[in-house]
A protein has these predicted regions:
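An N-cap/entry alpha-helix motif that binds or orients negatively charged groups
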Residues: 30-97
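Catalytic beta/alpha-barrel core
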Residues: 117-126, 143-151, 165-176, 190
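Alpha-helix-loop-beta-strand connector modules within alpha/beta enzyme cores
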Residues: 128-145, 182-190
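Alpha/beta enzyme core
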Residues: 98-117, 157-165, 179-182, 188-189
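Short hydrophobic targeting helices and cationic amphipathic motifs
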Residues: 6-9, 19
Length: 190
């Protein structure tokens, strides 16, 4: 079984459901992933109408590269690194933080020694906002990961423009070709 899991991690082309984990719980997890990914595609379509891809790309390319930024360094340390998460809600827990002082939370993470901060920007299921990441970026010096359901290259350029140093790519919702393309764009942007 270990070989099968390793194959999934390396190819990112198979789903856990294909590996004999046919439980109702797993099926529910995949259904919510697919639902959130579909919602993300709708958000991207609306965002492209407000700010076309070409403009998002131009803005992102004007920004400095983050190559060599502490995000890579944080993950390469010989000690265990930790990334703290700023999250208002989740599909499984519902509303986690009705009062949501996200900037204060980020400051406290940085003061406590976090190596990076993951900021949820997915709005429909996690009640995240791009604004959270932008305002946190203005406040802390440590690297920021935009945690969203990246389903289009547009979201990578947008992430750079709102202040992210890294993006989350979820293998289960991307084809191997998309994963390779999106990782390349992220590397190009630094």
């Amino acid at each position: 079984m270990h070989d099968k899991v390793l194959r999934v991690l390396l190819t990112c082309g198979a789903r856990i459901l294909d590996l004999d984990y046919e439980t109702t719980e797993r099926q529910d997890e995949w259904m919510i992933l697919d639902t959130i990914a579909a919602s993300a595609k709708e958000r991207v379509a609306a965002a492209k109408e407000a700010l076309p891809l070409a403009e998002q790309i131009a803005r992102a390319r004007e920004l400095d590269s983050n190559t060599g930024f502490p995000f890579e360094q944080a993950l390469a340390k010989k000690r265990m690194s930790f990334i703290c998460e700023v999250k208002k809600a989740s599909p499984s827990k519902g509303l986690i933080a009705p009062e949501f002082p996200y900037v204060q939370i980020a400051k406290e993470y940085e003061a406590a020694g976090a190596d990076a901060i993951s900021v949820l920007t997915e709005s429909a299921y996690f009640q995240g906002k791009n604004e959270y990441l932008t305002k946190i970026r203005q406040t802390v010096q440590i690297p920021l990961l935009r945690k969203d359901f990246t389903v289009d290259e547009y979201m990578i350029y947008e992430a750079k423009n709102i202040g992210a140093d890294a993006v989350l790519l979820i293998c289960a919702i991307l084809s191997p070709m998309q994963l390779s393309e999106y990782a390349g764009i992220a590397r190009e942007l630094g």
